[in-house]
């Protein structure tokens, strides 16, 4: 049995098998459009920040100065 899915970008049907070079996308174009959306942050994985300042203090967390610039 062959599985058919919808391309996440354009919704065209895509056959899901070894011959599908761009799965789950229908083409390289749709694949690159999706990559561009991730790179421009149109897509993002939601993050829930459960770590409170108090917990960070208890763990001895100190903010790294590596990326800070001198003012």
Swiss-Prot record:
Q: Which GO terms describe its molecular function?
A: DNA topoisomerase type II (double strand cut, ATP-hydrolyzing) inhibitor activity; zinc ion binding
Q: Which organism is it from?
A: Shewanella amazonensis (strain ATCC BAA-1098 / SB2B)
UniProt keyword annotation of Cell cycle present: no
The answer on whether this UniProt entry bears the keyword Amino-acid biosynthesis reads: no
Job description of the protein: Inhibits all the catalytic activities of DNA gyrase by preventing its interaction with DNA. Acts by binding directly to the C-terminal domain of GyrB, which probably disrupts DNA binding by the gyrase.
Protein name, please? DNA gyrase inhibitor YacG
Q: Which GO terms describe its biological process?
A: regulation of DNA-templated transcription
Lineage top rank: taxon: Bacteria
UniProt similarity note: Belongs to the DNA gyrase inhibitor YacG family.
- UniProt remark on cofactor binding: Binds 1 zinc ion.
Which positions does UniProt annotate for Zn(2+) binding? Answer: 7, 10, 26, 30
* Assembly with partners or alone: Interacts with GyrB.
Check the record and name the Pfam families matching this protein: YacG
User: What keyword terms does UniProt attach to this protein?
Assistant: Metal-binding, Zinc
**Cofactor or coenzyme needed:** Zn(2+)
């Amino acid at each position: 049995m062959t599985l058919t899915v919808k391309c996440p970008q354009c919704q065209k049907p895509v056959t899901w098998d070894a011959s599908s070079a761009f799965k789950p996308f229908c083409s390289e174009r749709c694949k690159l459009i999706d990559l561009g959306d991730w790179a421009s942050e149109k897509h993002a994985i939601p993050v829930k920040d459960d770590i409170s300042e108090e917990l960070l203090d208890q763990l001895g967390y100190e903010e790294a100065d590596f990326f800070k610039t001198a003012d």
